[in-house]
Amino acid sequence: MTEINYNLPVWDLTEIYTDIKDPKIKTDLKKIKDSSNKFVKKWKGKIKDLNSLDFLKCIETYQKICENLHKIGTHSSLIFATNMEDAEISRYNSSVSDEFTEIFSSLIFFTLELSKVDDVKIQSWMNNNNSSKWKPYLNVLRKRNPYLLD
């Protein structure tokens, strides 16, 4: 028979947050919510009319919001994966998941509007050298367009 090794390695997530009670988590979530709210107010309903510079500002802001949110999400899911029976960790993971869902729900307009931008406009955005790195993302998004809900 194979012997089970219960001394498995443990992730060191202190580079992200010290623990699930780290006050920086709440601070970061507030910053992300504030950034998301500003993003929605500034860009919702306007994506198809952006010039190439505004497109670049918009998509880079969206990227930063997503990166920051995924940092918290990664922390909570990895801690939860290592100890699913701990009630406090479970509550933390559930709370982060709820925040994650709320924020991304407010941002869904971005990918929906972006997927409907016509080819001429996208090409004008891509003519800006700094925007061309987004072409693969836009291509994938546009291929999914028929399957997206309004």
List each model region and its residues.
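A well-structured
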Residues: 1-150
